[in-house]
Amino acid sequence: MPAASRCMALLRALLGALLLPMPGVWCFSELFFVREPQDVTASRKDAVVLDCQARGEAPITVTWLKNGGKVSENERIYTLSNGSLYISEVEGRKGEQSDEGFYQCLALNKYGAILSQKSHLTLATISAFEVQPLSTEVQEGGVARFTCKIAANPPAVVTWEVNRTTLPLSMDRITALPTGVLQIYGVEQKDAGNYRCVATTITSRRKSAEATLNVIPASDLKPFHKPAIIAGPQNVTASLHQTVILECVATGNPKPIISWSRLDHKSIDVFNTRVLGNGNLMISDVKVQHAGVYVCRATIPGTRNFTVAMATLTVLAPPSFVEWPESLTRPRAGTARFACQAEGIPAPKISWLKNGRRIHSNGRIKMYNSKLVINQIIPEDDAIYQCMAENSQGSVLSRARLTVVMSEDRPSAPYNVHAETMSSSAILLAWERPLYNSDKVIAYSVHYMKAEGLNNEEYQVVIGNDTTHYIIDDLEPASNYTFYIVAYMPLGASQMSDHVTQHTLEDVPLRAPEISLTSRSPTDILISWLPIPAKYRRGQVVLYRLSFRLSTDSKIQVLELPGTSDEYLLEGLRPDSVYLVRITAATRIGWGEASLWTSHRTPKATSVKAPKSPELRLEPINCTTITVQWQQDSDDTAAIQGYKLYYKEEGQQENGPILLDASDLEYTVSGLDPRRKYHVRLLAYNNMEEGYQADQTVSTPGCVSVRDRMVPPPPPPHHLYAKANTSSSIYLHWGKPAFTSAQVINYTIRCNPVGLQNASLVLYLQTSETHMLVQGLEPKTMYEFAVRLHVDQLSSPWSPVVYHTTLPEAPSGPPVGVKVTLIEDDTALVSWKPPDGPETVVTRYTILYASRKSWIAGEWQVLHREGAMTMALLENLVAGNVYLVKIAASNEVGEGPFSNVVELAVLPKETSESNQRPKRLDSGDSTAYSDYYHLDQKSMTGIVVGVCIALTCILICILILIYRSKARKTSAPKPVQQSTDQLSHTNISLASANEVEKSIDGIAENAESLLPMIVGNSFIDAKGGSDLIINSYGPVTKANCKKRWLFFQDTKKMKTEEPQRRFVQAVCLYQPGTTVLISEDDSPSSPGQQSNFQVPFSIAADTEHSANSEGSHETGDSGRFSHESNDELHLSSVTSATPCATSHFVSSDLGKNVMNSTISDSKESPLLFATDQPATSPLQIHSAVQN
């Protein structure tokens, strides 16, 4: 910017020539500050200099202001020749003698004045310690932490002493934070002693009380300890360029690793950030972009076991301009507009100065947000204007010059202006033409505004030059208005006419008062009301009319009260009855509109211990929100358990009850409609009964968009996004609509569980950001969220609802029922049950196992299994070792605690070979480490006894069978039925067996496969000497038995081909209970008859089988498992190496039952069998499954 001494002559010559026809325009050499005062902190009796140097056209006068008032200079305080303020000795006494305060310098020349930024002068102080270090007891190897806090200006430097000597900080395990925290990691015995902190400032030094550190010897056993953050980060608010420390101290075994991240997933600034000690985050030269939520995470190495702590860093920034006002040149009666935009944290407040003095809005000068508009410019408006933005962090100013151009040919002002009231909303305004240059007038401008109050808006109406009167008919009743007239010509406008004030007439009230109803006893109602706002009163209220009646009675009683009253007590009413009340107000003109009926129930006559009605007060906050406040009567002795709040729009259904605590005295009702009347009732209750209720009505004001119908409501926020952060918090993010460039936008977030019944649980949160972390939610619960915005007194509709569910809680307990079973020489099976608790969600299990030697070294082997599995294999175990096993459950939130350690002894090979398998060493959930898993003497004795009993039973059965077979050799052959023992192997039901007994007379109950069978025309010799088969045609020659591999046949197909007859032949293989051969024939079989074979099912011997541990499942009592047992089941074929020796007569119906009961899943698993079959006999092979 050029200085006045360099450009004065040139500017005067050029502008003098250019503006020769326009007298009144001068050269303006800009006035500005070279140096401005800064914030200063000084000690008492110190000398202080506050700089202030201005440049511009001389002469420049500099004066100083303190807290807005002029500084009185004396020998101690005076202005230097360069404009700076000098204070020889700073005084710090309380009251007027103190020099502390905000200082500004004002520079003035003939074109105007400018004001500097504020300078805050403070005295250096230090207070007593707010937090003293406390004695503590720490185990050797643990973490010790001391803290102290003291308020000082400037901030004190904190150091530490141990046993009254300076604590050396050269060791890596000792960290002293600038915030006054001392951390000692890996505590040793030599660290024991007395600690204290020392706070030092430029003026003084203070020492805290001493705290003792006692060190306890560490135990040899160091059990696993889940990570815990014992000192997490705290919310911090810092100014720009300061240094911030976020503390994080964690314990655990093994030692946890501490890491830092941001909740918004932005990267942490590595250039200004470093880690102090073992995990404290230090951010130097803080900037606005550093603000956010920082997350400290402590993790056990090699596991997913972690815990987190969060803190919010808020960075405050002084104001800075993003738009500056520009100098303007305007003619008289023109309009000047200055724009100014500033940003900062918190949002700065904008104000305007004219020649260093604050401007207030009036009729001509208006301030819209951050804009300054000057209408009907007059010569006095020629000045320097400054935009000042200020917040708690400081102030900044920007300047602009308004130059008013004058014209000599302008007309004189209209005169003899007078006004006459026409009605409650109209005034007639008349005037006379200007005395000078009236023939050049082309139009008149009528200006009017309310005479009372501040910041009233001025209205303007332009009319032609052919009239000298005008009726303004949009005025408010019973109000004073001020008017003036301006005449216009092509080259400019006249001066303003004289001002005239006139009063409009009264009118009937536009609205009824808001009433409140309470009861002091069961037989009365106290009616109270608030005065009608002047906007709706339209005059002075002289009368009130109260109307009331029973809700069941149509008779209305009316009372008239003077306009000065504000309450009335109705007495002699019925207890426990609903009364309807309404009120009307009147001015001298007449009665206004009555309110709607308001209901109130009188208390019960027996309500002697019921709480009295609270004193209720309603206040609208904005067009959609009201605040409900109440106060309980101090003389009320009844117990109060809580409050019930109800509200409704007139003519609509009531909402509530909203249940509130007894300590609550305020509640905010949101989501209402503008310009609506609402009825609110509140009552206290206890465990005996409900108390007396208080009723009151309130009207919500109109929103700008509703009142004018010209500005539509803003659109709601878009792209609302929700993401579960923890089990108790959900992160919300949404987009800002592109409809406006407004800097200040506030948002309301509505949050409630899905299907909520109690309206008091609806949560409304406020923020100015486009994101929020909603905390304090219930785990594993679905919530619905909606957002609306507020800008310039406008509120948008609610955004579309978004649903999201919080994460489940991390498992609180370990898996239960942990068992370990040795199933191979080097393989063990571990099984468990999920943690207790129906709400526990498990997505993964972590199995840690190690031998004793590895455990001592801290080396664990890790296995992971999905949450649906409750078994796993431990492979490659070394014989002769004892293994320790423990299990933990985890989900996406975190990992739960580990179970108690379970031991498994893997015996040496020579020991395991001497004991025949299977031997399973089952291990239960145990806290003792010495429980070895082997078969004791009692178990071996039980096994031997059981085997002996089984062998004895088998021997007895064989003897009985031999005895019965000999007894039947002499008897005539009879058809017999298979024994119930045989039927048990072929899955023949008892019901089917009973039917056979009824149809066949004389069937032996326990016939075995060694007995001969005769039926009709066939006889089979089963004595063992021959395999000859004789039928009605004679002996049947049996060819050599051939092995054939057969597949299962369809059961349905077999049934359709099976002849319907009563008896069939059945030839059994040598192995009872394994394969049944049934010969079916209505007539003797011919040699060429084709055989039909069907092999339903067969089970192999029970063998040990173990699938991959990745697919393990709990099988219940046996402990064996198989994830794919259906696919891997191996069935062995049953073959006969000897000729068929026996035959049975079996009922045809029984054979069908055999088929139905034994053929299962044959379509899914066709199995191949080798059978010995005679070439000429049609046989069907039935395999029975033993359960």
Swiss-Prot record:
GO terms for cellular component: membrane. The chain crosses the membrane at residues 942-962. May play a role in anteroposterior axis elongation. It comes from Gallus gallus. SMART domains: FN3 (SM00060), IG (SM00409), IGc2 (SM00408). Residues 963-1187 are cytoplasmic. SUPFAM superfamilies: Fibronectin type III, Immunoglobulin. Disulfide bonds join C52-C105, C148-C197, C248-C296, C340-C387. It comes from the Eukaryota. Gene3D superfamilies: Immunoglobulins. Belongs to the immunoglobulin superfamily. DCC family. This is Protogenin.
